[in-house]
Amino acid sequence: DLEQRGLLDETLIIWGGEFGRQPVFQGKNGGRDHNPKGFTYWMAGGGVNAGTDYGETDELGHEAVVNRHHIRDLHATILHLMGLDHEKLFYHYGGLDQRLTGVVPAAPIYPLIS
């Protein structure tokens, strides 16, 4: 166990995916399509503000309506927790500074960081 061994504070644990599922049943064959407008991540350890619930979806669970962020902001947060500055970590290609968070501005989600 990471906490028992004193390693939890320096180990970042992340569970999630880059999209959720539509909150309603679709079509005669069943199933639910991808939903990039509302999804879940679970984070613990390594600098994460423990016990934090952040953001909400609408009443149907279709899309985020409170504390909305693009996935690139989550990537910037993860890089920050790993001790990396996402704005300084880039390579120049095709006339653009290519970052792990993309070419569009991103920022760490500071309420998630302890």
Region locations from a protein language model:
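Ligand-binding pockets and gating/stacking loops
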Residues: 1-114
